[in-house]
């Protein structure tokens, strides 16, 4: 038996080990790796490198080694004629996934290689379409707006014979517009997508299940932009649409699929959670939090047994981290610091356990932001400042949402300085929040900057300006149901002009639902003054309730109440973590997941 035959036998053994139940992956990788120590032909070397690269790609965290073997396979197959075209395209597709989902290497070479394959290779439309999607994604990572739009248009033009793929690429073009340009797509593009969907819905030959998947992609693309902008009220119809589209079982789809039904159901849950957070409905946030964590863990567990594409795994990991972050923010407002620190610890643990650097890179600034908020409630102002600055330092400036996140951190740092009347520091930070510098940020952030400006105007005795800005905040927040922002704007307005019972009563009512003790305290205090001025009996049941809520929230907000809640928690040391390895502050045997 020659060496090539032995290598084939070893690859067969590796595949048998991989498909066992349970799989023996380490042994499978050893078998595949051993083939490369043999004297085999270049053709066999290409095949062995591809198989070993695939095993490392799907089943290990050794991305560098996977990349090297896949690159070797691609280079060798490129010189071996058309027989290996499919394998060669699979190799470059996996290399593209590694560059997209782990972002550890320069993108110039992989983009050029994919473009070459797209323009020169024929006969494998599904793989060519996948490579076009991957090239668009790589250009988005590079923030190459022109290149991404150009690639979308090229893909659209090459897909006229396949309406479903044309639709996918047209929707991808709107996604580029939303993510990189932060604006609505051209009306003609939207009209064209709508007309194509209608034609397919009326067609007797169209794949209905696949069409529903494409529609989900379109709706979620639009929803993501609406949530970025803070369009809570106007997103509700689309949110209901994505909920109704979910079914109980996985449907069979031929061709490219955006997300499987379990994943898209999970995405719908987290979008509902975002909507609930914006509307200050803490109980609803917590309800979806438990649902998302349960189902995300189930999907992640299954992915360890049956390989998933990195994009799907990354999506689920991002969803899990996002829901932990939202729950942590709600726990800060509800004066539950012990639960906040549990959420933070879970975020650190999960990003540390999960393959690749992206979760840690993306969410570390968010973790510092949460810890900064919590320090504000402990009146640890210096620690809060340090956390916000640490978040700015660790923020990856090339991320798509980095500009908005940086503005949010500057906003919170400015509020922290203003609360302490550190005016020189406030002026320095507020320079980063001028209208030109936040022009490309979300409308929600701009509204919060407007509230900060109103607060500053009040402190500096510019009462007319404070009144004007407060009214603008109320109008903006009422339009999209930003209940907390509306409540804070109303309370600030009450400092410079009279507010009646009709105006403050809604804030009093929803503040209890939000468990936001800052707003509960101040809204009930204002409500008490209005009722007393209107002649209400201080001993009436209504007045007793108002006073009782004030006292309860004042007690909850007191440092004397908050500090003992975390006094014996090892995770409380994270409040002093600003740099370095956070796990050095924590006992390694503590398990929270």
Curated annotation (Swiss-Prot):
**Which InterPro entries does the record cross-reference, listed alphabetically?**
MAU2
State how it assembles: May heterodimerize with scc-2/SCC2 to form the cohesin loading complex.
Q: What are the subcellular locations of this protein? A: Nucleus, Nucleoplasm; Cytoplasm
Source domain of life is Eukaryota
Q: Which gene encodes it?
A: mau-2
Family, according to the entry, reads as follows:
Belongs to the SCC4/mau-2 family.
What is the protein's known function? Plays an important role in the loading of the cohesin complex on to DNA. Forms a heterodimeric complex (also known as cohesin loading complex) with scc-2/SCC2 which mediates the loading of the cohesin complex onto chromatin. Required for normal development until the fourth larval stage. Functions cell autonomously to guide migrations during the development of the nervous system. Participates in the guidance of mechanosensory neuron AVM by a slt-1-independent mechanism. Regulates chromosome segregation in early embryos.
Query: What is the protein's given name?
Result: Maternal uncoordinated protein 2
- Phenotype of gene-disrupted mutants: Chromosomal, neuroanatomical, guidance and egg-laying defects. Altering the activity of both the dorsal repellent slt-1 and mau-2 leads to the abnormal dorsal projection of the AVM axon. Migrating cells and axons are mispositioned along both the antero-posterior and dorsoventral body axes.
User: Any one Gene Ontology biological process term?
Assistant: maintenance of mitotic sister chromatid cohesion
A single GO cellular-component term from the record reads: SMC loading complex
This protein's species is Caenorhabditis elegans
> Which terms are listed as keywords in the entry?
Cell cycle, Cell division, Chromosome partition, Cytoplasm, Developmental protein, Mitosis, Nucleus
């Amino acid at each position: 038996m020659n060496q090539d035959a032995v290598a084939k036998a070893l690859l067969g053994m590796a595949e048998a080990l991989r498909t066992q139940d349970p799989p023996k992956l380490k042994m499978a990788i050893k078998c595949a790796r051993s083939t490369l120590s043999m004297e085999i032909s270049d053709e066999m070397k290409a095949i062995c490198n591809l198989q070993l690269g695939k095993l490392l790609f799907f089943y290990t965290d050794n991305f560098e080694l996977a990349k090297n073997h896949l690159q070797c396979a691609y280079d060798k197959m490129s010189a071996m004629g058309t027989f290996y075209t499919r394998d060669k395209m699979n190799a470059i597709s996996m290399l593209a996934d590694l560059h997209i989902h782990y972002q550890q290497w320069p993108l110039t070479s992989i983009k050029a290689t994919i473009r070459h394959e797209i323009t020169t290779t024929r006969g494998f439309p599904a793989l060519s379409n996948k490579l076009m999607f991957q090239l668009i994604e790589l250009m988005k990572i590079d923030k190459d707006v022109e290149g991404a739009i150009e690639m979308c248009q090229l893909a659209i033009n090459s897909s006229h014979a396949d309406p479903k793929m044309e639709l996918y690429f047209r929707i991808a073009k709107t996604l580029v517009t939303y993510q990189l340009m932060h604006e609505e797509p051209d009306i003609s593009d939207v009209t064209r997508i709508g007309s194509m969907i209608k034609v397919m819905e009326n067609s007797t030959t169209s794949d209905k299940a696949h069409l529903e998947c494409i529609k989900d992609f379109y709706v979620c693309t639009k929803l993501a932009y609406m949530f970025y902008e803070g369009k809570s009220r106007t997103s509700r119809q689309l949110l209901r649409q994505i909920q109704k589209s979910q079914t109980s079982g996985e449907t069979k789809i031929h061709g490219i699929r955006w997300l499987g039904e379990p994943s898209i159901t999970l995405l719908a849950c987290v979008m509902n959670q975002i909507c609930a957070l914006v509307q200050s409905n803490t109980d609803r946030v917590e309800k979806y939090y438990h649902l998302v964590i349960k189902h995300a863990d189930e999907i992640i567990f299954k992915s360890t047994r049956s390989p998933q594409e990195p994009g799907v795994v990354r999506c689920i990991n991002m969803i899990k981290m996002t829901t932990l972050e939202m729950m942590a923010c709600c726990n800060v407002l509800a004066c539950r610091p012990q639960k906040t620190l549990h959420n933070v610890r879970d975020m650190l643990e999960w990003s540390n356990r999960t393959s690749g650097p992206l979760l840690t890179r993306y969410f570390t600034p968010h973790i510092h932001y949460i810890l900064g908020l919590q320090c504000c409630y402990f009146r640890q102002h210096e620690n809060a400042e340090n956390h916000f600055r640490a978040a700015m330092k660790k923020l990856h400036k090339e991320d798509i949402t980095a500009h908005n996140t940086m503005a949010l951190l500057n906003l919170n740092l400015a509020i922290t300085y203003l609360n302490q009347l550190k005016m020189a520091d406030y002026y320095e930070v507020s320079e980063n929040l001028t209208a030109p510098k936040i022009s490309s940020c979300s409308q929600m952030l701009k509204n919060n900057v407007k509230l900060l400006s109103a607060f500053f105007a009040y402190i500096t005795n510019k009462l007319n300006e404070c009144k004007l800005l407060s009214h603008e905040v109320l109008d903006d927040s009422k339009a999209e149901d930003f209940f907390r922002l509306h409540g804070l704007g109303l309370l600030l307005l009450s400092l410079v002009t009279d507010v009646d019972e009709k105006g403050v009563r809604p804030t009093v009512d929803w503040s209890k639902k939000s468990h936001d003790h800052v707003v509960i305290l101040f809204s009930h205090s204002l409500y008490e003054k209005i009722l007393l001025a209107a002649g209400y009996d201080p001993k009436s049941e209504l007045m007793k309730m108002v006073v009782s809520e004030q006292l309860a929230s004042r007690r909850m907000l007191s440092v004397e109440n908050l500090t003992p809640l975390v006094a014996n928690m090892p995770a409380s040391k994270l409040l002093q973590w600003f740099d370095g390895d956070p796990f050095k502050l924590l006992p390694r045997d503590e398990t929270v997941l």
